[in-house]
């Protein structure tokens, strides 16, 4: 209560909300006042305009007023109220002309308040930065009304790239584009204690802030996996094949009205191959319950990283037995569904390519037609090796199709080589 007004202004945050058109006119709370408070004095001009408006109205003949004046004059005379000659003039106190009546217009005299939402917010952010009175700015839904390329411009204007910022900016967002444009040390995750934590430590009722220090791997994770920062839990998948498998199984569960990982707030992040361990640690350090879903074809090389992740509380789900994801698929697939897998490979690579891949990995002993029409158990490792080395399914779309339309509907027929880790994951 005892703070001087100038000190209150320094503490009071400026808010850039979804509607901010009032800042494009000289209203009482407009940012334009902060740009012009020492130079703009239009009181005399507005008073003169009020008098001119009153005089101009008096010179106009307003239809219907004369009859009303005659009736009022008659009634006042009958009652003995002395009013003299009646006139209908503008009451100077009824003409509301203030600084708020002055607004910005463009070259064709269109008020700038009619700009689109995104354009007006972008302009106002620049005005607020120029005014620089408030050291705190609150931005609600930074992406609202803006194309992605203009989001970058807005964040730059707010100081996202400045090494020595002069203002503190609090941003709420639901856009991965916004996160990708931030520096890693600008991202902070605020969490409230869980019911279990409160039960064991009632005094720990405050929120906890998790932050990043801006390291290279953190910045890379923020840009590569921005969508995952909006979820409740994260599955860091080694690559796109694993992402596709999880998504495909999840879609099949959705098709059958079963619980899905998406409904539980879980998102699959791209681990980027061997970077998956470092990326998982980034999410875990921010308080996200984190798991890694990987294949096992590099188990010896990953052993140290795997143990470190487990000790950090990160769950590990993998096929085991040094199997790649393609191994797990072909080893566990029932024979009658092998052609369906090959059909998906044909869509991506073509029959001729599959023929050469299979012959190259079988010492030219078998070809595509042998596997497609006369499949035997001994062909499984050849198909798995061909699929792995020649990337038959190494993308989200083919792996998702396999999981949704082949594995999911025939789940009970697949062996535990595939089902075991998936059961644990789901």
Residue ranges and their predicted role:
Residues 9-13, 133-134, 183-186, 263-264, ...:
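Short glycine-/polar-rich loops that comprise or flank the Walker A/P-loop
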Residues 20-23, 143, 175-178, 194-195, ...:
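Conserved nucleotide-binding/hydrolysis micro-motifs of P-loop NTPases
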């Amino acid at each position: 209560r005892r703070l001087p007004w100038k000190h209150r202004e320094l503490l009071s945050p400026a808010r850039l909300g979804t509607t901010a058109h009032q800042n494009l006119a000289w209203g009482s709370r407009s940012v334009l006042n902060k740009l012009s408070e020492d130079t703009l004095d239009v009181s005399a001009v507005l008073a003169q305009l009020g008098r001119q408006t009153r005089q101009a109205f008096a010179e106009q003949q307003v239809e219907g007023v004369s009859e009303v004046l005659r009736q009022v004059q008659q009634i006042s005379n009958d009652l003995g109220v002395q009013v003299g000659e009646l006139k209908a003039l503008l009451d100077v106190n009824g003409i509301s002309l203030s600084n708020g009546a002055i607004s910005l217009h463009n070259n064709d005299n269109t008020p700038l308040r009619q700009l689109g939402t995104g354009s007006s917010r972008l302009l106002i952010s620049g005005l607020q930065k120029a005014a620089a009175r408030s050291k705190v700015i609150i931005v609600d839904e930074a992406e609202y009304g803006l194309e992605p390329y203009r989001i970058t411009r807005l964040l730059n204007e707010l100081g996202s790239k400045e090494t020595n910022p002069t203002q503190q900016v609090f941003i709420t967002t639901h856009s991965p584009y916004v996160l990708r444009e931030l520096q890693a040390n600008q991202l902070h995750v605020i969490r409230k204690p869980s019911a279990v934590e409160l039960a064991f430590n009632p005094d720990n009722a405050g929120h906890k802030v998790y932050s990043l220090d801006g390291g290279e791997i953190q910045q890379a994770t923020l840009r590569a996996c921005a969508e995952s920062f909006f979820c409740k839990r994260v599955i860091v998948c080694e690559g796109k094949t694993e992402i596709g498998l999880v998504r495909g199984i999840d879609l099949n569960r959705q098709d059958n009205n079963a619980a899905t990982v998406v409904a539980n707030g879980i998102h699959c992040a791209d681990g980027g191959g061997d970077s998956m361990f470092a990326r998982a640690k980034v999410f875990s350090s921010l308080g996200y319950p984190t798991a890694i879903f990987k294949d096992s074809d590099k188990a010896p090389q990953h052993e140290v990283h795997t143990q470190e992740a487990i000790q950090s509380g990160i769950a590990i789900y993998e096929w085991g037995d040094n199997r790649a994801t393609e191994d797990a698929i072909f080893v566990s697939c029932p024979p009658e569904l092998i052609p369906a897998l090959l059909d998906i490979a044909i869509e991506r690579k073509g029959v001729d390519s599959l023929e050469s891949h299979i012959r190259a990995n079988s010492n030219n002993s078998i070809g595509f037609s042998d596997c497609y029409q006369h499949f035997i158990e001994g062909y499984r490792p050849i198909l798995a090796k061909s699929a792995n080395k020649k990337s038959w399914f190494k993308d989200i779309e083919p792996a998702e199709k396999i999981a949704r339309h082949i594995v999911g509907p025939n789940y009970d027929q697949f062996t535990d080589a595939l089902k075991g880790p998936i059961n644990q994951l789901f």
